[in-house]
Design a protein with these regions (language model features):
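Contiguous, glycine/small-aliphatic-enriched amphipathic segments in soluble metabolic enzymes
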Residues: 1-52, 95-180, 184-191, 195-199, ...
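A glycine-rich helix N-cap at a beta->alpha junction
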Residues: 53-64
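Conserved hydrophobic/aromatic beta-strand scaffold that supports enzyme active sites
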Residues: 55, 67, 76-78, 206-208
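Short beta-strand/turn micro-motifs at beta-sheet edges
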Residues: 66-67, 109
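Short beta-strand
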Residues: 68-69, 113
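Ligand-binding beta-strand-loop-alpha-helix segment within the catalytic cores
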Residues: 69-99
């Protein structure tokens, strides 16, 4: 069964995840770096989630963790996460977009030590709705959420049309980008950084990272798989852990 999905493989994946999260909870380890899972064969009575992000959020008693794809030159967060695209528009609200902006801003400060991060927010519709011609979500939901974030002192801008934003390298002017749905954010992220990117779960009390690729059964036994993304995930987990420790120390011993 080498290189194929099996029930036993899914069971082993979940047992490994349980053991790791148990060690994390008992402070035997400091960070969690997860390998890719098969989201289908891991499903069981103990794991009824679309992915690691939702499982770890539930385990940590966090309502709304942020899926945050990170590389040296690009960071992309996702508002709606692992849901069918047919449900994206109905899921978007001012409140959940604002919550993600606030969460992203806090992570950039605490986890990446960026004092005044600049956040770009993407639109949902083609050309960011063209002032309502191609959809109302931008003017009715997204733009008001961005305005509310700005009123809170967060440097949030948008909504920007996703295609032109990445095509013109506009992302380079910002510390992070907030996409409305999974593929809107992950397609450009992986196209620009594949092999170097990391999936980071922001908003958790623990530090968790993962490589930006899947199980890649087709590469099993060939000796051609790259370790670079997993290596980047290990390094980012270490960096975030140290950054959090630094921020905590600074807050406890402020300059007088």
């Amino acid at each position: 069964d080498l290189g194929s999905s099996t029930k036993e493989g899914g069971e082993c994946s979940f047992k490994s995840l349980e053991a790791a999260t148990s060690d994390l909870a008992s402070n035997k380890i400091d960070v969690l770096v997860t390998a890719p899972i098969n989201k289908d064969n891991i499903q069981s009575d103990g794991f009824d989630f679309p992915g690691h992000t939702e499982y770890l959020a539930k385990l940590s008693n966090v309502d709304n963790a942020l899926m945050f794809m990170c590389s040296d030159n690009l960071r992309v967060g996702i508002v709606t996460g692992h849901i069918p695209i047919s449900k994206v528009a109905q899921t978007l609200t001012q409140e959940n977009i604002l919550a993600k902006i606030v969460q992203m801003n806090a992570s950039l400060i605490q986890d990446f030590v960026i004092n005044r991060p600049k956040i770009a927010v993407l639109g949902l519709n083609p050309h960011a709705g063209e002032k309502g011609l191609l959809g109302d979500e931008e003017k009715d939901i997204i733009a008001p959420a961005v305005k509310r974030a700005s009123e809170m002192g967060i440097l949030a801008f948008g909504p920007y049309p996703a295609d032109g934003f990445f095509g013109s390298t506009g992302y380079k002017k910002f510390d992070a980008v907030l996409a409305m749905y999974h593929d809107q954010g992950l397609i450009p992220f992986k196209a620009l950084t594949f092999g170097q990117g990391v999936n980071y779960t922001a908003g958790l009390p623990i530090v968790r990272t993962s490589p930006d690729h899947g199980t890649a059964y087709d590469l099993v036994g060939r000796g051609t798989a790259s370790l670079s993304s997993f290596q980047s995930a290990v390094f980012l987990a270490r960096d975030v852990y140290l950054n959090r420790a630094f921020q905590k120390e600074v807050s406890l011993t402020p300059l007088k």
